[in-house]
């Protein structure tokens, strides 16, 4: 629910900044929040006399879910999902798909074509670390535009991991936009994160989101500071802050 609120309010700001008319107002968002009922994963909920709903982890972003509708007395089972991710990440478990029965599936199709074969995670991480090291060792600054929800937190974990291991050159990492707000929400719901990350947040002093490498740029007047300084650094920013 907090993540939904953050994303919807940000959408209003982005739309207005583009000179367009938002399709809903802040008042609409607050009204939706008051009328929203949250459901945990894996719980059967009667949403009408003959339809039952079960939400399951979609593996996309924090709180994302697939919707399994059991219609009638077992007459039909329908699954709807938006974005899904089958691979387990450093942040979330892979999407749940172990449904007893499914007659109809409505599914998103990003990267769904035969030629949409993505490189392995290790290949991507190796290439990323190599590129960043090249810039930092030359005294440069690395600007990484990224969505604030999901990918930013995953990237934070990658940077923290490789800097601690010595494979990535240590440098200050500045974060802009609503990344910090989204990260705080992740820390507030560790039960929805992968087991290893949940344990780090709850049981140790090794929370990667609180890493010494990260600095949040809170005020617009501070945005130029990382650029003025002559030291190498990494800047992680949402598109609205570029």
Residue ranges and their predicted role:
Residues 1-154, 160-167, 172:
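His/Asp/Glu-rich metal-coordinating catalytic cores
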Residues 129-242:
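Hard-cation-handling environments
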